């Protein structure tokens, strides 16, 4: 069976840390910021670590060879 390719869209959205955790940009920051709380806007800056089950799914299905 041929080697599974890394999904190009996942390459751009996720990074795998040295310890195997998956980092991604926080959701909900595209528009509609006027009705968001200041705390939400602050917390959604930068990247966040995905929950362990979600991270495992991302790596298994979209990033089989890591990054």
UniProtKB/Swiss-Prot annotation:
Q: Which GO terms describe its molecular function?
A: structural constituent of ribosome
Name a single GO cellular component. Answer: cytosolic large ribosomal subunit
Per the UniProt record, the source organism is Sinorhizobium fredii (strain NBRC 101917 / NGR234)
Family membership: Belongs to the bacterial ribosomal protein bL35 family.
Domain of life, source organism: Bacteria
This protein is called: Large ribosomal subunit protein bL35
Q: Does the keyword Ribonucleoprotein apply?
A: yes
GO BP field: translation
Question: Keywords on this record?
Answer: Ribonucleoprotein, Ribosomal protein
């Amino acid at each position: 069976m041929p080697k599974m390719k890394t999904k190009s869209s996942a390459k751009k959205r996720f990074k795998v840390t040295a310890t195997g955790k998956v980092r991604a940009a926080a959701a909900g920051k595209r528009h509609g910021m006027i009705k968001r709380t200041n705390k939400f806007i602050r917390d959604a800056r930068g990247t966040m670590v995905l929950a362990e089950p979600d991270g495992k799914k991302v790596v298994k299905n979209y990033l089989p060879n890591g990054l």
